[in-house]
């Protein structure tokens, strides 16, 4: 067993991969746990164990809870993927419609995208489409970041296949995320 561990460790180093124990040291952001007592949180998945790629929205919604996904309307913007996009850009969906699409296209990676959650009682005609969220907003990297769209409750951002950002995530959903990913980080200005 030790020979196999040494072999795998050497192979990982030669290929340039980072082991999960090393990945904890690479993130510049502080661990999220324990979460402070507050109504919303700005969180970041980077250097987490057990994540084959960071922008698998089906998996993220499953962890947050499909029930939560269905509780909101969703505006999806700034979509880019390495596949034939299942969603037009921009896209307005009920939570049930988003769930159906994400389940129909499992493990689909969004390289860039912003999933903005809206109250279930807001109509598409009431949404200001002049201020569409961008996945490359510099405001994410500031203390106390807020959802980009003025009417959004929170945002999930697929950032260059490297990170998944959660801006203004409600406390209940933040606890689910941190429970699933103990390596989850607090997003703050460094």
Question: Model-derived features: where do they sit?
Answer:
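Surface-exposed, low-hydrophobicity interaction/linker segments
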Residues: 83-157
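Short, Lys/Arg-enriched N-terminal segments with co-localized hydrophobic residues
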Residues: 1-3, 35
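Ordered hydrophobic segments in well-structured contexts
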Residues: 42-46, 52, 73-75, 112-117, ...
């Amino acid at each position: 067993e030790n020979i196999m561990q040494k072999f795998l460790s050497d192979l990982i180093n030669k290929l340039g991969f980072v082991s999960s124990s090393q990945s904890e040291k690479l993130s510049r952001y502080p661990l999220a746990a324990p979460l402070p007592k507050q109504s919303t949180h700005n969180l970041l998945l980077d250097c987490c164990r057990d994540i084959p790629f960071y922008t698998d929205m089906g998996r993220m919604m499953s962890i947050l809870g499909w029930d939560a996904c269905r509780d909101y309307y969703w505006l999806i913007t700034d979509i880019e993927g390495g596949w034939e996009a299942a969603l037009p850009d921009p896209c307005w969906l009920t939570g049930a419609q988003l769930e159906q699409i994400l389940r129909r296209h499992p493990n689909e990676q969004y390289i860039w995208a912003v999933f903005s959650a809206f109250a279930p009682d807001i109509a598409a005609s009431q949404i200001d489409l002049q201020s569409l969220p961008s996945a490359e907003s510099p405001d994410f990297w500031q203390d106390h970041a807020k959802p980009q769209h003025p009417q959004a409750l929170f945002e999930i951002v697929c950032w260059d296949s490297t990170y998944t950002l959660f801006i203004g995530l409600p406390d209940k959903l933040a606890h689910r995320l941190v429970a699933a990913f103990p390596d989850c980080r607090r997003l703050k200005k460094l």
